[in-house]
A protein has these predicted regions:
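The conserved beta1-alpha1 loop
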Residues: 27-31, 96, 225
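Catalytic histidine-centered segment of alpha/beta-hydrolase-like enzymes
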Residues: 255-264, 268
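Conserved hydrolase catalytic core segment
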Residues: 88-132
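N-terminal cap/lid segment of alpha/beta-hydrolase-fold proteins
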Residues: 1-12
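Active-site loop/oxyanion-hole signature of alpha/beta-hydrolase fold enzymes
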Residues: 57-94, 269
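Conserved HGGG/HGGXW glycine-rich cap/lid loop of the alpha/beta-hydrolase fold
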Residues: 11-62
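Conserved alpha/beta-hydrolase catalytic His-Asp/Glu region
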Residues: 148-205
Length: 275
């Protein structure tokens, strides 16, 4: 994997690149608070067949940070800008949570850009869920603001996250990748790459407009969900897949929102099946 840089709205954004230039194109978009490198196992495995690029969204990984955004279109625009930078007229894409929701919003803008989408529990809230967040706030934003931002070292961070109850179901390699790509060394020790304020602002931003554009998504789309999703409304998922006979909604038994970190082998199998 090689790390690259490009400019987006005055920000320096980073992405990981792997695979042959003359193979089919594949874009990967990560979840809120994480980074492209958390999906290193997908990048490495799929680079045998694809030219893979995985973006660090602004404020994540090695990309420059900002609080200067007002909705999630900021993130879908970054994905489209990266494909423009790469000269990709058409590609397939994998997204998780924020990354999945941002890819779907990007497909609303330009569905011809994408051949296939495989999105894991994408954040696509219903009208009522959006209204709740607007009125009462998102509980996840409160969790993000309270997140510990600094550590004495990356080694200490690895010990903490390896034992943390929230990571109990994660594979060991996934925890190691999180510390490698989402925590950076500083002169004082180590800190989160994604500042709690950025993560919280992302969780707090909801809007209705994209729900009126779901019919624009015409490309083959596979929505991979846990038995019960808290972030992707059933009717939204159905509306997304209704315009392409190859599209589908796939519920994975005994899985959760963080499946790509809890079962990497199964995640790769699912991706390989649908791409």
């Amino acid at each position: 994997m090689q790390r690259r840089i490009f400019e987006f709205q005055g920000l320096r954004l980073s992405y990981l690149e792997a695979g042959g230039q003359n193979t089919s194109k594949l874009l990967i978009a990560h979840a809120n608070g994480y980074a492209a490198g958390c999906y290193d196992y997908l990048i490495t495995a799929l680079a045998e067949r694809y030219h893979v690029c995985a973006l660090d969204f602004a404020g994540h990984g090695e990309s420059q940070s900002t609080l200067g955004f007002s909705n999630w279109n900021f993130f879908s625009a970054q994905l489209l800008a990266l494909t423009d930078h790469l000269g990709w007229q058409r590609c397939s894409a994998i997204g998780h949570s924020l990354g999945g929701g941002s890819l779907l919003r990007a497909a609303e803008v330009d569905h011809r850009r994408f051949e296939k989408l495989v999105v894991f529990d994408p954040v696509m809230l219903s009208f009522l869920m959006i209204l709740y967040v607007k009125l009462f706030g998102n509980p996840m934003a409160k969790v993000a603001r309270a997140r510990r931002p600094t550590f004495s070292s990356k080694e200490q961070a690895l010990k903490i996250f390896s034992r943390h109850p929230a990571n109990r179901s994660w594979e060991r390699e996934a925890v190691a990748a999180y510390v490698e790509y989402c925590i950076r060394a500083t002169t004082q020790g180590a800190e989160l790459c994604c500042a709690p304020a950025v993560e919280a602002q992302i969780f707090s931003q909801t809007e209705f407009a994209h729900l009126f554009k779901l019919g624009r998504i015409r490309n083959e789309t596979h929505i991979v969900l846990p038995p019960k999703s808290n972030v992707c409304a059933d009717w939204v998922a159905r509306k997304i897949v209704r315009h392409n006979r190859q599209s589908g909604i796939h519920r994975i038994p005994d899985s959760g929102h963080l499946l790509p970190f809890e079962n990497r082998r199964l995640t790769l199998e699912i991706v390989s099946r649908f791409l």
